[in-house]
Every structure is written in C-alpha cells, then in structure tokens.
Amino acid sequence: MRISTDQLATQLARKLAPLYVVFGAEPLLTLEAADRIRAAARKEGYIEREVLTAEPGFNWSSLNMSANSFSLFASKRILELRIPSGKPGVEGAEAVVRFCQRLPNDTICLINLPELDRTQQNSKWFTALEAAGVAVEAKEVARQQLPMWLGERLALQKQQCDKETLQWLTERVEGNLL
C-alpha cells in the first residue's frame, strides 16, 4: 500500500504495519516520516533498534541474519535498512524480495530510500516491499502549495504570520526545506 506523508499519522494511529518503506524527493519529509514511524513503534514497546546501511560491499546476508536473530534485551525491535543509492543491485534485490516473504515477528522494519524513478518503483524488489507493508512517499512540495504548507506548519506550532512574511519565507526555502 502506498500513502503520502500527510496520510502517515492516520495510518500509524490505526495499527503498525510490519514494514514501512520511506522514500521520496523531499529529504525533510522523509526524515520526519521515519521519525514518526520510530516514535509510534517506541510507543508500542519496540525499544531496541538495529540499523543496517547498504553501501558498496554490503553483505546482504546480514539482512536476513538480523531479521532472524533474537534480542537479548527486548522482545520487540525496529530493524532499519538504509539504501542511500536506491539501487540494491542484483544480490540486494533478491535479498529484499526474500526478506519480504518472511518478515520477522515482533519487529517493525523500516526501509529508507532516496527518490526513486519510475523504473525503480516498478522493479520486483520495490513492488515486493510495497506489497509487504506501507510505502510512504515524500513528494516535493510544489511552489504554488508552499505558502499554504508553511502556514500549516506554523499553525501546528501555534505560530502565525502575515501573508508578506509567508511569501518571504516561501522565497527563501523553495527547493530546500531542510
């Protein structure tokens, strides 16, 4: 299932999925989505966290070893896999598909990816991730939507500003919300 970052809070309030994939064009929104997922998991007792980063030379068998290992300290844990390039390669793609077929119990899996093109999103490994859990897409905030988006963000913090200030902020952060 694919949702937007705006829909994530509603999805997390219902029930935690065993797998979340966070990807997209807007780094701030991907960071915030991953933080929300981790916070919701901690609230449900998922205390321990293991992070794997798939860089060149990554041993893909470590993904399944981590998934199948038991924690000495906590019964519930978060297993996070970061694929900074968004390209797991042939071996990685096969490992991801196998991983999706046997998701570990008492583990919330969080996969962090950058922006993916249409070919990557239609790949076997990504469609397996999407079918096994919830894919959260962080789309870039369009220029015409940015003033409203900034206003909503300010309102969430119980702040407000006039239209001229909002326009000034929009001009300064366009293309770089971080």
Summary of predicted features, one role per range:
Residues 1-178:
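Conserved beta/loop motifs at nucleotide-recognition and modification sites
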